[in-house]
Amino acid sequence: MAARTVIIDHGSGFLKAGTAGWNEPQMVFPNIVNYLPCKENPGPSYARRRVSLGIDICHPDTFSYPIERGRILNWEGVQYLWSFVLENHRREQEVPPVIITETPLREPADRKKMLEILFELLHVPSVLLADQLQMSLYASGLLTGVVVDSGYGLTRVQPFHQGRPLPASGKTLEFAGQDLSAYLLKSLFKEDCDRRCLFQLETVAVTQMNKCYVPQNLGEALDFRERQQSALDESNTYQLPDGSRVELTPMQRVAPEMFFSPQVFEQPGPSIPRAIVESVESCEISLRPLLVSHVMACGGNTLYPGFTKRLFRELMGDHVSSTKATVWEGSNRNFSVWLGASVVAHLSTYQSEWMSREEYGEHMRM
C-alpha cells in the first residue's frame, strides 16, 4: 500500500503531511482555519462564511483550531484541511490511499466520523487510522520502550512492549506547548495580552524558538540570568517584528522549565520525568529496566536546548538511579509520528489494518 500513500499527521498545533517514503513531510502548516465573510451570498444561511487556511490578516479574530488538546472540536475545519492536503497530492484526478494518525483520546464516535469524511466526502480509495504514539515508536526502529511525546496540545507518556502499548500504563498531561505560549503571552504583554493579536502571537513564537531553553538547575539558572541582566547582557534582549526591542526576564528565558516543574507555573502535575517513572512502575517488574533504558523523546517541546539532557539527569538522579536510563533523541523527532507512519505504509504485516471503500460500504450496510 506504500505506492503514493499520503500520510496526514494532524496534531493540535500543526498538520504534517506528505507522501510515504520521504525523509520528512512535504507540507507542514498550523492547525488553523479561518472563516471569512462570503460576499457572494450575504443572506442568513450557512454559506455566508467561507473556510480558508491559516489566519487572515484582515479578519484576525475569525480563526479556529479544529483540534484542541488532541480532541476534534471542529469537523468542518478538519475536512477542509484534509481536502487541502489531498488536492495537493492528487494526480490525474486520482485520490491516493491515506494514513491518518489519531490520538488515543479520540471519542468512540470520532473514528466513524473520520471514515465518513474520508470515504464519503473526500472519496479516498483506502484508509489506515494509526495511533500517534505507536507511530513514534516505529520511527525509532524499536519495539519496546517508553514514548514521551510533548506537542502543542498534550504531553503523553506510553510504555510499549513488542510494538504494543502496555495496558493501563499510559499518562496524559494537559500541559504542553500551548500552555508555554500562554505563559509567555501573559508575561510579555500583561493586561494587554490578546491571543488573537497577530503581532503578539508572532512575538511569542519568536521568543520560544530563539530565546527559550531548559535549565539544568532552575535556581542556578535564575541567579545566572539575574547577573547577566544587571550587566546589560545583549542575550537577554531581542528585536520584535515591528523593530522595537524587548528585554526578557530570567523566568521567561527558562519558561520550558514548565515541563519539569509544572507547579512553579501553576500547572497540574506530575512533571514529565515523574510521569515516566509512574508509567514504568505500573508495568511488570521484569520489564522496567528495559523500558527505562529506551525512553524516546519526541514532539516539538523536546527540541528546546537542554530538554533531553535534563530529562536524563532527572531520570538517573531522582527517580530510577538503580537502573541505567537512556533517552533516545532523533534528529527529526518533531516529525516522528509522521515518519513512523511512513514506515508502516511499507509493512506487509499492516495490510489487514487497512480499510477499503468497499469494506466501508459493507460495514455501513450491516
UniProtKB/Swiss-Prot annotation:
Name of protein: Actin-like protein 8
Record Pfam families: Actin
Keyword Cytoplasm belongs to the record: yes
Predominant location: cytoplasm
GO BP term, pick one: cell motility
Tissues expressing this chain: Strongly expressed in testis and pancreas. Weak expression in placenta.
Domain of life (superkingdom): Eukaryota
One cellular component term from this protein's GO annotations in UniProt: membrane
InterPro entries in the cross-refs: Actin, ATPase_NBD
Keyword field: Cytoplasm, Cytoskeleton
The organism of origin for this protein: Homo sapiens
